[in-house]
């Protein structure tokens, strides 16, 4: 069974790229056409690349690896936290702090400080201190929690990272590349595919698209964890969105018809506009 369907991708708006004046020419091979000044991403390729990324993530986790989720733009923050938490993986959905990967030993010391402050608060360690001292310690704890809470249990650099919007997360991408950590990423039409090991061509600005593709990666992790523990079971499938427009229904029908002749459905195209972050 497919990891994700053409209809789910269409429902989420994954096919909408950026305006044609805002693009990276290196993404040309992933573009199907353009409509009303908006590039339309080739979802047939998206399905193929999703399968490749899914298999890589599943095998990485099955063999004991971990995947860090990175997405600090507003549209990605909630799904990044929810899906990473669902499968027990580290995540960054606030500001990326320089050195999170390349200087992890220092970051790990800050994590120890966070746990120390939390322990003090829970075991009465704040008692006997002045109100000013308690306020300063609480502020320090809250600041560390906000910036490092998603990686609080990370003991070493991850085996791979999953990124929503490689342009916005260029610092994370640069650090991962410096350490030769594989990068899985949603690639919109304004991104550079050369910096990514496992690209997933798609809309990284729409909330539903980012959520769907993040959920797919988390499901690959869940399956990898099951394989690691010797358990059998299927992955959780992403949910479909709102009803398709008539032209999208025709596109879907065309893709379904093509399935009998090829291994993957064909992608076609669109009107409307994209949500841009």
Curated annotation (Swiss-Prot):
<dbReference type="Pfam" id="PF00318">
    <property type="entry name" value="Ribosomal_S2"/>
</dbReference>
<dbReference type="InterPro" id="IPR001865">
    <property type="entry name" value="Ribosomal_uS2"/>
</dbReference>
<keyword id="KW-0689">Ribosomal protein</keyword>
<comment type="similarity">
    <text>Belongs to the universal ribosomal protein uS2 family.</text>
</comment>
<dbReference type="GO" id="GO:0022627">
    <property type="term" value="C:cytosolic small ribosomal subunit"/>
</dbReference>
<dbReference type="InterPro" id="IPR023591">
    <property type="entry name" value="Ribosomal_uS2_flav_dom_sf"/>
</dbReference>
<dbReference type="InterPro" id="IPR005706">
    <property type="entry name" value="Ribosomal_uS2_bac/mit/plastid"/>
</dbReference>
<dbReference type="GO" id="GO:0003735">
    <property type="term" value="F:structural constituent of ribosome"/>
</dbReference>
<protein>
    <recommendedName>
        <fullName>Small ribosomal subunit protein uS2</fullName>
    </recommendedName>
</protein>
<feature type="region of interest" description="Disordered">
    <location>
        <begin position="255"/>
        <end position="277"/>
    </location>
</feature>
<feature type="compositionally biased region" description="Low complexity">
    <location>
        <begin position="257"/>
        <end position="277"/>
    </location>
</feature>
<keyword id="KW-0687">Ribonucleoprotein</keyword>
<dbReference type="InterPro" id="IPR018130">
    <property type="entry name" value="Ribosomal_uS2_CS"/>
</dbReference>
<dbReference type="GO" id="GO:0006412">
    <property type="term" value="P:translation"/>
</dbReference>
């Amino acid at each position: 069974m497919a990891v994700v369907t053409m209809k789910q991708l269409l429902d989420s708006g994954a096919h909408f790229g950026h305006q044609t004046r805002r693009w990276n020419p290196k993404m040309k091979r992933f573009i199907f056409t353009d409509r009303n000044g908006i590039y339309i991403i080739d979802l047939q390729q998206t399905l193929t690349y999703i399968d490749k990324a899914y298999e890589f993530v599943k095998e990485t986790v099955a063999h004991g690896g971990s995947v860090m989720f990175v997405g600090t733009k507003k549209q990605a923050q909630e799904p990044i936290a929810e899906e990473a938490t669902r499968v027990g993986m580290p995540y960054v959905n606030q500001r990326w702090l320089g050195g999170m990967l390349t200087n992890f030993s220092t970051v790990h010391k800050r994590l120890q400080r966070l746990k120390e402050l939390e322990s003090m608060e829970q075991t009465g360690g704040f008692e006997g201190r002045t109100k000013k001292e308690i306020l300063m310690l609480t502020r320090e704890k809250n600041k560390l929690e906000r910036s490092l809470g998603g990686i609080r249990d990370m003991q070493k650099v991850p085996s791979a990272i999953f990124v929503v919007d490689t342009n916005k997360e260029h610092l994370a991408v640069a650090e991962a590349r410096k350490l030769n950590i594989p990068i899985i990423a949603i690639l919109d039409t304004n991104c550079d595919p050369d910096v990514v090991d496992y690209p997933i061509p798609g809309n990284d600005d729409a909330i539903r698209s980012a959520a769907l593709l993040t959920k797919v990666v988390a499901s690959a992790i869940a399956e990898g964890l099951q394989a690691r523990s010797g358990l059998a079971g299927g992955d959780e499938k992403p949910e479909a969105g709102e009803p398709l427009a008539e032209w999208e229904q025709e596109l879907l029908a065309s893709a379904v018809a093509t399935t009998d002749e090829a291994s993957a459905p064909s992608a076609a195209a669109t009107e409307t506009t994209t949500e841009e972050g």
